[in-house]
Amino acid sequence: MINMRKTHPLLKIINHSFIDLPAPSNISAWWNFGSLLGVCLIIQILTGLFLAMHYTSDTLTAFSSVAHICRDVNHGWLLRNLHANGASMFFMCLFLHVGRGIYYGSYLYKETWNIGVILLLTVMATAFVGYVLPWGQMSFWGATVITNLLSAIPYIGTTLAEWIWGGFAVDKATLTRFFAFHFILPFIIMALAIVHLLFLHETGSNNPSGINPDSDKIPFHPYYTIKDALGFMFLLLTLLLLALFSPDLLGDPDNFSPANPLNTPPHIKPEWYFLFAYAILRSIPNKLGGVLALLASILILLIIPLLHTANQRSMMFRPVSQTLFWILTANLITLTWIGGQPVEQPFIIIGQLASMLYFMLILILMPLAGLFENYMLKPKW
């Protein structure tokens, strides 16, 4: 009798995706982040669902409903801490996942890569609207500053901003619709993640060498299921350490004060995972220019496949490109640091230089490095 998992209409799909899937034999721990992101998404949806049962999306009661969750709901404090720090873990895994894709040339699977960039944008949108929900000072002012950027769009900007606010400023209508968005978007992310996997399984996984691995494949189960399980343990351990020992480490103290439209915090800044983009936004002393730079800093990922000039796919055997990649990594860490600093010297000039270097590395230096490495590999005799 043929195994049921190979014949049953539903089990067959799961089997082809997670059990009998042929996978390269040499993929490293950098390939664990896809499954870790799946676990993060499930954790966020489950904790978020239970939080939504007790949260009220009204300006008068939102802040106190979050306090009520933490004080009065059974294990509400744990749900809230897991959800807030789960977002940080989500972005940590996302950035490492994207970094892996750039380093090993995975972006040459264009459909998978483009869906991935759309996923990144959707997750960023979800995190932004979610941060507004507790209705603390930084929630309110973060929402005000970021949605206000829409007014920089010529001609339709102000109308667009007011349409999103549901009034003339961030208020009750804004909070209600942001809660609706925050509830629906994770399910859209889940659907997109399935499409992401669908495109990936059309081509099969890339591997560290960047060479076609078809001649040496192994079944996903048990080899990579057990490897993923180890990753899950590390992820859950880190998340629990964060949520149980220092739940407010990555948050902003201003968010412990209820939103007050009459009192602006001294330093308005988003959560740590948006600081690199915020630094790029602030580095241009023009509203529209800053908004365009902010968009470009993320959308630039879409043109990375077009900028691939090297004859080799992976950076594994390309030392010049490797050096530039790690400079880019250091540059992004620098931008993250600058985004959390006040707008004064020397932070302004450091932010401007780091922003310029970010675009130069991706658009000019890395493609040139690829061409240089091609030249160096050509026989000279």
From Swiss-Prot:
It comes from the Eukaryota. CDD domains: cytochrome_b_C (cd00290), Cytochrome_b_N (cd00284). Heme b b562 binds at H83, H182. Gene3D superfamilies: Cytochrome Bc1 Complex, Chain C (1.20.810.10). GO terms for molecular function: metal ion binding; ubiquinol-cytochrome-c reductase activity. The keyword Phosphoprotein does not apply. Binds 2 heme b groups non-covalently. It is found in: Mitochondrion inner membrane. Its cofactor is heme b. GO terms for biological process: mitochondrial electron transport, ubiquinol to cytochrome c. Keywords: Electron transport, Heme, Iron, Membrane, Metal-binding, Mitochondrion, Mitochondrion inner membrane, Respiratory chain, Transmembrane, Transmembrane helix, Transport, Ubiquinone. One of its GO terms (cellular component) is respiratory chain complex III. InterPro entries: Cyt_b/b6_C, Cyt_b/b6_C_sf, Cyt_b/b6_N, Cytb/b6-like_sf, Cytochrome_b, Cytochrome_b_C_euk/bac, Cytochrome_b_N_euk/bac, Di-haem_cyt_TM. The chain crosses the membrane at residues 33-53, 77-98, 113-133, 178-198, 226-246, 288-308, 320-340, 347-367. A ubiquinone binds at H201. It is a multi-pass membrane protein. Heme b b566 binds at H97, H196. The cytochrome bc1 complex contains 11 subunits: 3 respiratory subunits (MT-CYB, CYC1 and UQCRFS1), 2 core proteins (UQCRC1 and UQCRC2) and 6 low-molecular weight proteins (UQCRH/QCR6, UQCRB/QCR7, UQCRQ/QCR8, UQCR10/QCR9, UQCR11/QCR10 and a cleavage product of UQCRFS1). This cytochrome bc1 complex then forms a dimer. Heme 1 (or BL or b562) is low-potential and absorbs at about 562 nm, and heme 2 (or BH or b566) is high-potential and absorbs at about 566 nm. Component of the ubiquinol-cytochrome c reductase complex (complex III or cytochrome b-c1 complex) that is part of the mitochondrial respiratory chain. The b-c1 complex mediates electron transfer from ubiquinol to cytochrome c. Contributes to the generation of a proton gradient across the mitochondrial membrane that is then used for ATP synthesis. Belongs to the cytochrome b family. This is Cytochrome b. The lineage of its organism: Eukaryota, Metazoa, Chordata, Craniata, Vertebrata.
